[in-house]
Every structure is written in structure tokens, then in C-alpha cells.
């Protein structure tokens, strides 16, 4: 956790440039990303208040080969991309999630109400509710939090904006309440559950797996036994 003022200073002074290069690969994107992160932190301060926060990222994805074979028990080669969803987040002192996505109104939900609501099908709140329910059912600690998110993953462009969103919500809970101990495969599976059951979209698991594991991944869905292996960068 880092207080918002210090985070802005460190980003502006270039102390995280190596980290940005590792995440986004393209060094020409670093200045843009620094401004983007500073803006996100400033928006968090405006909407909520200056605070000690954590900043999370989940990338979009592109399939290399095997699109739609994930739900036909085939093999998939997919990769994360350097367009991502980032979220500035902190615990709050109640059982309420307050989530603001750039350009949208605040979503508020109580973590004690995690039942499927058919009226929420196809909405962002259903994804948050579904991820929280999945994490709780898997025995993980959940709690209230405030978050501001912004995304460069284009909606409707085949880059899995919804999967990136689900994964960033799961990663927020992993970071704030579970010491970042929820593994990426489980976050992906819970994200798929949220999209299938709460959002009401019968998607496969490729999108969430590529977004959560990161890098290039080879996924084998044969006999419904999930095996995933990161592929080398070079």
C-alpha cells in the first residue's frame, strides 16, 4: 500500500519506469502510462479521498490459435497484450463495495448480498457480485473496498474487456484481503463463473485465463482437465 500523494510523486519522478517497461514492453508508452496512472490516482482522490492505496492491472488478450476450442475441449494458444485495465483501490471500513469506472456512475453493492440477480444480467455490477461470490465460496476472505478503474481494453474489439475487468476485481480482493495468495488460474476460473452465472454469458475459459496468467499461455482443455503453461517470451 502507498499513499496517493507519494504514489503520484514516485510515478512522476520516474521511480516506477522500469516496472512500467516490464508491464507494457514498449518504452514509447511509458510517458503515456505515467500520465494515465497519475490521472487514475487523482480521480480516486477526488471521488473518495487521499488514502493508502494499492494499484492493480489486468491485461486484455488476443488468441493466437484455437479460438472457441476452449469450450470444445481443445487446445488454445493465447497471449495477454499491453492494453490493460488498471484499478486504484483501498479497503473501506464497511461491507460495501464502491466501484467507479472511468466515464460511468458509481456502482455500490453490499458484500452480504451475493445472490444471483437475473435483472442484473449483462451488467457490470453482476460481474463484481459474481466474482465476490465465487471467491467467498472458494473460502477466501472478502470485504468492502473503494476502487476507481480505467481501461484501455476496447469494448467490443475482441480483446476481452469483460475478462480483464473480472480479473482485476479478483486481483483487488486477492491483494487487499488475501495477501495476493489467490493464484491466477483460480482467479480466472472464478471470473468465468461470474460471467456464466451472474452476467449470463456462456463463455469459455480462454479469455479469463490469458488475462489472469499473463504472457503467452498454452491451455489444454482435454477431458475437462485444465492444464496451462506459460510460454517463453523470446
Model-inferred region functions:
Residues 2-75, 110-226:
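Gly/Ser-rich oxyanion-binding loop with an adjacent helix/lid
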Residues 75-93, 213:
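Structural signature of FAD isoalloxazine-binding scaffolds in flavoprotein oxidoreductases
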Residues 90-94, 98-117, 122:
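Acidic, low-complexity central loop/insert segments
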Residues 66, 81, 91, 101-103, ...:
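Glycine-rich, histidine-containing beta strand-loop boundary motifs that form or position
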Residues 101, 106, 160-162, 231:
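Short linear Ser/Thr-Pro motifs
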Residues 227-234:
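Conserved small/polar residues in nucleotide/adenosyl-binding loops
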